[in-house]
Amino acid sequence: MGQIFIKYSNDITDKLQEILPTDLKNLKINQSKYSFLMKENGGIYDDLIITRMKDKYMIILNAACKQNDLQIIKNKLNDQNLDMNNDLSLIAIQGPESKTILENVVSNVSKLKFMNGENFSFKNNEIFITRSGYTGEDGFEISLPNKVAISFVEELISKGSTLIGLGARDTLRLEAGLCLYGHDINENTSPVEANLKWAISINRINDNFIGSHQIKKQIEEGVSKLRVGIKPETRVIARESTKIFDERKRGNI
């Protein structure tokens, strides 16, 4: 994942709101929001998590898109010196036991509310933990220095955590209806078509941001395609891009 930190100011907030359909002005300190980097046609360059920290914004980007995302943000902020922090790792611990396990490694972490974060300490290193994740389960994401990432994971394992792969993550996020960029959403899919209108702040729908004209039009007039969940009746796997029919073609997996 890519991690970008941008010094907070009212001007920066205004500029970020031109490319994100999120109300950043009412974002509380240490609160996170799911958002999108918007395209002129209403499509999505990438989905992301933005957190308002005390004196800066933290933006978590998808690894496959991070360089393109970074350039878009640089251009909007007119700051070509803005860069990714490559000295940090991002670790996720998810599931119903995540709170108990993580509490045995970092004290008081269980007090965090969903989509909120705080600074903590691990082996005399400052780390930032948010109560978030992409599995539909309770969980936490930890931003920490690379030099302590392995020892942090080893601590989690010693307290009862188990390593999982992307297959397990993918199953969980599908069951929770969470999108994966490049599969369920892309540059030609709008938040409305992706059934992600909830992620557009209500007070921004009639506001100006990149792609806002198309978004408003789709909300008012409806869309010809819409992401929905389906449940197969048999054990046959519904693979990505499989065509869906009844008396005629209805869509794709």
Report the location of each language-model feature.
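Acidic, proline/glycine-enriched N-terminal capping motif
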Residues: 1-38, 43, 167
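Conserved, structured C-terminal
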Residues: 52-253
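Short, surface-exposed charged micro-motifs
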Residues: 47-49
